[in-house]
Amino acid sequence: MELFDTETGALIVIELAMRPHNSAHWTIEGALTSQFEQHLRAVLDYPLGVTTMTAPVVVMANVLAGPADVRPASIDERVHHCLAAWPDVKIHLYGKQFRPGRKVGHVTASGPDLDVVRGRARSAARYLMNGGELP
Protein backbone atom coordinates (compact mmCIF):
# COMPACT_ATOMS: atom_id res chain seq x y z
CA MET A 1 0.00 0.00 0.00
CA GLU A 2 1.35 3.42 -0.90
CA LEU A 3 0.20 6.36 1.23
CA PHE A 4 0.67 10.11 1.13
CA ASP A 5 0.80 12.08 4.36
CA THR A 6 -0.97 15.42 3.83
CA GLU A 7 -0.16 18.72 5.53
CA THR A 8 -3.21 18.22 7.75
CA GLY A 9 -1.91 14.83 8.90
CA ALA A 10 -4.45 12.80 6.95
CA LEU A 11 -3.24 9.70 5.14
CA ILE A 12 -4.44 9.17 1.58
CA VAL A 13 -4.24 5.74 -0.06
CA ILE A 14 -2.56 6.22 -3.44
CA GLU A 15 -1.99 2.66 -4.59
CA LEU A 16 -2.69 -0.88 -3.49
CA ALA A 17 -0.18 -3.33 -4.96
CA MET A 18 -0.68 -7.05 -4.52
CA ARG A 19 3.01 -7.61 -5.16
CA PRO A 20 6.33 -6.30 -3.87
CA HIS A 21 6.38 -2.55 -4.47
CA ASN A 22 9.28 -0.16 -4.98
CA SER A 23 8.14 2.01 -2.06
CA ALA A 24 9.01 -0.88 0.30
CA HIS A 25 12.45 -1.78 -1.08
CA TRP A 26 13.78 -0.43 2.22
CA THR A 27 12.71 -3.74 3.77
CA ILE A 28 15.60 -5.56 2.03
CA GLU A 29 17.96 -4.28 4.75
CA GLY A 30 15.49 -2.53 7.01
CA ALA A 31 13.26 -5.38 8.20
CA LEU A 32 13.96 -8.86 9.50
CA THR A 33 11.74 -10.21 6.71
CA SER A 34 11.83 -8.29 3.42
CA GLN A 35 8.73 -7.64 1.36
CA PHE A 36 10.05 -10.10 -1.22
CA GLU A 37 10.37 -12.95 1.27
CA GLN A 38 7.01 -12.00 2.81
CA HIS A 39 5.36 -12.14 -0.62
CA LEU A 40 6.76 -15.62 -1.26
CA ARG A 41 5.64 -16.80 2.16
CA ALA A 42 2.10 -15.54 1.52
CA VAL A 43 1.87 -17.05 -1.98
CA LEU A 44 3.22 -20.39 -0.75
CA ASP A 45 0.90 -20.36 2.29
CA TYR A 46 3.86 -20.35 4.70
CA PRO A 47 3.74 -18.53 8.03
CA LEU A 48 4.57 -14.87 7.58
CA GLY A 49 7.95 -13.69 8.81
CA VAL A 50 8.76 -11.22 11.55
CA THR A 51 8.61 -7.65 10.22
CA THR A 52 10.54 -5.96 13.01
CA MET A 53 12.81 -3.19 11.74
CA THR A 54 16.55 -3.83 11.89
CA ALA A 55 17.22 -0.31 13.22
CA PRO A 56 15.18 2.47 14.82
CA VAL A 57 15.34 4.46 11.56
CA VAL A 58 15.59 3.15 7.99
CA VAL A 59 15.58 5.53 5.02
CA MET A 60 15.49 4.65 1.33
CA ALA A 61 16.37 7.22 -1.34
CA ASN A 62 15.83 6.70 -5.06
CA VAL A 63 18.73 6.92 -7.51
CA LEU A 64 17.75 8.63 -10.74
CA ALA A 65 19.93 8.64 -13.84
CA GLY A 66 21.54 12.06 -14.18
CA PRO A 67 21.93 14.01 -17.41
CA ALA A 68 25.58 12.91 -17.72
CA ASP A 69 24.73 9.21 -17.63
CA VAL A 70 24.94 8.40 -21.31
CA ARG A 71 26.72 5.17 -20.41
CA PRO A 72 26.33 3.06 -17.27
CA ALA A 73 30.09 3.23 -16.52
CA SER A 74 29.75 6.77 -15.21
CA ILE A 75 27.46 5.66 -12.39
CA ASP A 76 29.48 2.45 -11.91
CA GLU A 77 32.56 4.56 -11.21
CA ARG A 78 30.62 6.59 -8.65
CA VAL A 79 29.50 3.40 -6.86
CA HIS A 80 33.10 2.75 -5.80
CA HIS A 81 33.45 6.24 -4.33
CA CYS A 82 30.05 5.95 -2.65
CA LEU A 83 30.92 2.63 -1.00
CA ALA A 84 34.10 4.16 0.42
CA ALA A 85 32.42 7.39 1.58
CA TRP A 86 29.32 5.80 3.12
CA PRO A 87 30.30 2.21 4.08
CA ASP A 88 27.00 1.58 5.88
CA VAL A 89 24.78 2.69 2.96
CA LYS A 90 23.49 -0.17 0.83
CA ILE A 91 23.33 0.42 -2.94
CA HIS A 92 20.92 -1.32 -5.30
CA LEU A 93 21.18 -0.68 -9.04
CA TYR A 94 18.48 -2.25 -11.19
CA GLY A 95 20.37 -2.75 -14.47
CA LYS A 96 17.96 -0.50 -16.35
CA GLN A 97 18.82 1.53 -19.43
CA PHE A 98 19.91 5.04 -18.43
CA ARG A 99 17.75 8.01 -19.39
CA PRO A 100 17.84 11.32 -17.51
CA GLY A 101 15.40 11.21 -14.60
CA ARG A 102 14.71 7.47 -14.82
CA LYS A 103 14.82 5.52 -11.55
CA VAL A 104 17.80 3.20 -11.90
CA GLY A 105 18.24 2.14 -8.28
CA HIS A 106 17.98 3.05 -4.62
CA VAL A 107 20.12 3.33 -1.52
CA THR A 108 19.21 2.39 2.03
CA ALA A 109 20.69 3.78 5.24
CA SER A 110 19.83 2.94 8.82
CA GLY A 111 20.68 4.01 12.33
CA PRO A 112 19.29 5.64 15.46
CA ASP A 113 18.91 9.28 14.33
CA LEU A 114 16.43 10.32 11.62
CA ASP A 115 18.26 13.46 10.50
CA VAL A 116 21.62 11.69 10.27
CA VAL A 117 20.23 8.63 8.48
CA ARG A 118 18.16 10.72 6.06
CA GLY A 119 21.21 12.88 5.34
CA ARG A 120 23.40 9.86 4.54
CA ALA A 121 20.78 8.29 2.26
CA ARG A 122 20.09 11.53 0.40
CA SER A 123 23.78 12.39 0.07
CA ALA A 124 24.68 8.95 -1.27
CA ALA A 125 21.77 8.97 -3.75
CA ARG A 126 22.62 12.51 -4.86
CA TYR A 127 26.26 11.53 -5.39
CA LEU A 128 25.27 8.48 -7.44
CA MET A 129 22.88 10.61 -9.53
CA ASN A 130 25.22 13.42 -10.45
CA GLY A 131 28.58 13.04 -8.74
CA GLY A 132 27.69 15.49 -5.96
CA GLU A 133 29.98 16.05 -3.02
CA LEU A 134 31.57 13.32 -0.94
CA PRO A 135 31.75 13.74 2.85
Residue positions per predicted region:
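Active-site "cap" helix and flanking loop/linker of ATP-utilizing ligase/carboxylase catalytic domains
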Residues: 1, 17-69
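A short glycine-rich, hydrophobically flanked beta-strand micro-motif that places a catalytic Asp/Glu
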Residues: 1-7
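Short, glycine- and charge-enriched coil/turn segments that flank and shape catalytic ligand pockets
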Residues: 7-9, 68-77, 112-119
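Short coil/turn motifs at beta-sheet boundaries
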Residues: 9, 54, 100-102
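Protein kinase-like catalytic core scaffold
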Residues: 10-15
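Glycine-rich active-site loop/lid that clamps phosphate-bearing ligands
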Residues: 54-55, 63-98
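Generic C-terminus detector
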Residues: 92-135
